[in-house]
């Protein structure tokens, strides 16, 4: 006996990352939330499952509370079922167990207070799955979740091409998984739903004539509106078509779950929503900016767990930490993900907010600690003061994190692993007008070399890094050795250089280090620059300056003044750094390049000292 109808789990999923611009929320509301909810409300017989992240629901509560009233009414008449999950749409596989449970319970509590019911099932962000997720999901009372039909195929589901719900198990805990038919989701947004479902049912009955039940789940995220057709009308057209469809009836998954018997048992491999997507664990390795956020998250978690006896403060710190765990930072690039500096800024602000909470109610003792912060098997060096964190590494001998804690801002939140005090030795004929950031042909680009630790003075909090002469005889300026000393005193980071010529011939070169700073944005609305001299501070209208004693940077958003000075006058160039991997130029940082002409006889030394001061 063939299936007479499709049992359709119609769903709606939406999320806007924490830290996104308000216009992103308004666009999501206008294109999906309002038309879907208001359209569904007109058709009481169409049931649906809704998953909207805690970030989005909280914004709706403040900006469009009338929408929550419609949802509450439909929950009350059992037309819709709210799905749980992590409040901040976290990348579940890579966050600690206590954070998985904490985020899920936070959204569960919100939904219960808002709509009067605990969710029975949940949404897995980006369908980022590892089998070990079953235990924490089940421990939080989640009886079911959803994964893509592609993931069902990877797990060895029904070879006929249509997947049935299944059981997943881990450490004695089980959860039911519903397949989401992604090709149908796309088709529904482009074509009339009734003939699509009719063709789907016919094909299913041909392939599986003995099956009497055919469950299909879809979460369409967009629908094509015709010419002069509003989004409200387009979604309403979908609901009208579905209400007249004879080939399907809708149901909520929680009710279906009670009647499902004899489900197959499957084990899903580590996977995500599309074949092109890499796992979140690989993502943080391939993209250093994601790896930096992940490392800071792990480090901050360690600090929080060291708190003893103050449960309220510990919970507050965890709730700040959770804001930085959004999946967009660990699975997507471009404006919707990692290359949106607003999202990274918000993540670091939350992490630093959590760190500040761990320091409350105690006298903070400044320190210099060797620690494998990046979890790469090599030690980094962490300077920590009351106002500034400054982290240095042997790779390139640069500073890779520079936190100004009073404003909860990481000024090294740059893109592509860019650092401060990344050293470059250029040919002496190199013109300042031609200077660009990054590697330069014919130069010694020291940021790709390994610096050895020469000395570590934890008491005086000083670190000396050494770069030997190049082992490659033909390398440019390979006879130049560099000693670099870092220290941190209150609001100022010091970097002292000594260059030595270990060769037998005179060396002429231009020293042009890169100091990358992640400022709030590009242009005078965000930042202003001034060249400093003994006479006056001169506003910079051009990216070039000459003979300056220092450079002042006014961060207008954070109301912070950053001053870069040197014990020698210097020329320099300022260049914005953008990322255009996805075809759209997105601001990431500002590269400051002071320039010095150096001439060294054999055995001769030359030095310069920088001071980078923060104030507000």
State the predicted function of each range.
Residues 98, 113, 118, 123-168, ...:
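Gly/Pro-rich turn-and-neighbor structural signature
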Residues 26-30, 98, 102, 386-459, ...:
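Acidic-aromatic substrate-binding/catalytic surfaces of carbohydrate-active enzymes
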Residues 118, 202-209, 467-521:
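Acidic, contiguous internal or C-terminal segments within carbohydrate-active enzymes
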Residues 2-34, 41-43, 162-175, 181-183, ...:
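Active-site and substrate-binding clefts of carbohydrate-active enzymes
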Residues 370-372, 447, 456-478, 492-494, ...:
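Beta-strand-rich recognition/accessory modules
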Residues 97-126, 199-218:
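CE4/NodB-like, metal-dependent polysaccharide N-deacetylase domain
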Residues 491-494, 500-572:
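Polysaccharide-binding surfaces and accessory modules of carbohydrate-active proteins
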Residues 5-96, 103, 120-124, 143-149, ...:
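Short, well-structured secondary-structure segments
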């Amino acid at each position: 006996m063939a299936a007479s109808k499709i049992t359709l789990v119609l769903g709606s999923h939406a999320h806007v990352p924490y830290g996104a611009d308000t216009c992103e929320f308004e666009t999501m509301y206008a294109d999906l939330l309002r038309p879907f909810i208001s359209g569904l409300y007109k058709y009481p017989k169409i049931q649906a499952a809704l998953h909207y992240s805690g970030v989005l629901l909280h914004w709706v509560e403040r900006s469009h509370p009338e929408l929550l009233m419609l949802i509450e009414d439909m929950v009350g008449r059992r037309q819709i079922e709210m799905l749980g999950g992590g409040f901040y749409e976290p990348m579940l596989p890579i966050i600690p167990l206590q954070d998985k449970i904490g985020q899920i319970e936070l959204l569960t509590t919100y939904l219960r207070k808002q709509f009067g019911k605990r969710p029975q099932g949940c949404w897995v962000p980006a369908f980022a799955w590892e089998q070990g997720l079953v235990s924490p999901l089940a421990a939080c009372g989640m009886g079911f979740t959803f994964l893509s039909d592609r993931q069902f195929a990877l797990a060895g589901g029904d070879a006929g091409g249509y997947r049935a719900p299944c059981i997943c198990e881990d450490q004695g805990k089980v959860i039911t998984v519903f397949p989401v038919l992604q090709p149908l989701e796309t088709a529904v947004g482009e074509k009339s739903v009734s003939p699509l479902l009719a063709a789907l049912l016919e094909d299913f009955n041909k392939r599986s004539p003995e099956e009497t039940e055919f469950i299909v789940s879809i979460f369409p995220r967009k629908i094509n509106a015709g010419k002069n057709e509003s989004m409200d009308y387009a979604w309403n057209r979908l609901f009208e078509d579905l209400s007249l469809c004879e080939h399907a009836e809708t149901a909520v998954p929680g009710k279906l779950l009670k009647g499902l018997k004899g489900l197959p048992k499957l084990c899903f491999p580590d996977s995500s929503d599309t074949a092109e997507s890499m796992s979140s664990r690989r993502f943080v390795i391939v993209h250093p900016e994601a790896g930096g956020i992940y490392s800071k998250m792990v480090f901050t978690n360690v600090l929080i767990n060291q708190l003893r006896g103050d449960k309220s403060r510990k919970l507050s710190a965890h709730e700040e930490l959770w804001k930085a765990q959004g999946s967009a930072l660990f699975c997507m690039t471009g404006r919707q993900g990692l290359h949106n500096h607003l999202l990274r800024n918000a993540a670091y602000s939350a992490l630093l907010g959590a760190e500040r909470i761990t320091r409350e109610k105690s006298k903070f003792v400044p320190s210099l600690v060797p620690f494998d912060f990046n979890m790469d098997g090599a030690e980094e060096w962490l300077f920590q003061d009351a106002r500034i964190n400054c982290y240095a590494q042997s790779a390139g001998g640069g500073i890779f994190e520079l936190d100004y804690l009073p404003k909860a801002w990481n000024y090294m939140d740059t893109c592509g692993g860019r650092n401060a005090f990344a050293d470059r030795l250029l040919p002496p004929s190199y013109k300042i007008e031609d200077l660009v950031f990054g590697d330069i042909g014919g130069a010694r680009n020291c940021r790709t070399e390994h610096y050895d630790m020469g000395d570590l003075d934890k008491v005086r909090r000083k670190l000396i890094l050494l770069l030997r002469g190049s082992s490659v005889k033909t390398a440019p300026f390979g006879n130049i050795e560099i000693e670099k000393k870092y220290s941190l005193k209150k609001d100022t980071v010091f970097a002292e250089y000594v260059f030595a010529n270990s060769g037998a011939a005179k060396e002429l070169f231009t020293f042009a280090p890169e100091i990358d700073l992640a400022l709030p944005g590009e242009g005078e609305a965000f930042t202003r620059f001034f060249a400093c001299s003994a006479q006056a501070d001169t506003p910079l209208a051009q990216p070039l300056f000459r003979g300056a004693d220092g450079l002042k940077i006014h961060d207008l958003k954070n109301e912070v003044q950053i001053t870069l000075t040197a014990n020698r006058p210097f020329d320099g160039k300022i260049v914005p750094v953008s990322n255009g991997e996805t075809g759209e130029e997105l601001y990431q940082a500002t590269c400051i390049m002071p320039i010095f002409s150096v001439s060294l006889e054999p055995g001769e030394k030359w030095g310069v000292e920088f001071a980078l001061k923060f104030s507000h």
